[in-house]
């Protein structure tokens, strides 16, 4: 990325974090319109890396929306997949309720577990 961005656009930097485009919302709709959704998903699934599972953000962080609703991750938030069966506000949460709670997953989760993994801090392994 650093080489291409410098060559094409003259952009120079010390650090670059890249995250996988999740096949949800606008990007998912774009892929579907172009007939590329299944190919993209197959690529993510075929590159699943079990070593990424301990480092995915949903294992240690939650996402809170502007109304105080709790989600396992930013992507679940965009899909309105609440952490609990019923929406819960952060001010109603007893923190211990999160310990051992199941993480809601979907096909989009392969985006964080493909290859070297993906998170806001960069690759996972």
Pin down the residues of each PLM region:
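Radical SAM enzyme [4Fe-4S]-AdoMet core and its adjacent flexible, acidic
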Residues: 1-54
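Residue-level detector of functional hotspots within protein domains
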Residues: 2, 46-48, 61, 95-98
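Short, surface-exposed linear patches
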Residues: 3-5, 38-41, 59, 84-86, ...
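Generic structural signal for residues positioned in beta-strands
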Residues: 15, 61, 108-111
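Structured loops at beta-to-helix junctions and adjacent beta-edge loops in soluble globular domains
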Residues: 19-21, 65, 115
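Generic hydrophobic/packing signal
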Residues: 25, 56-58, 81, 123
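C-terminal accessory regions of radical SAM enzymes
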Residues: 45-76
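Flexible mid-to-C-terminal extensions adjoining Fe-S/redox cofactors in radical SAM and related proteins
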Residues: 70-125
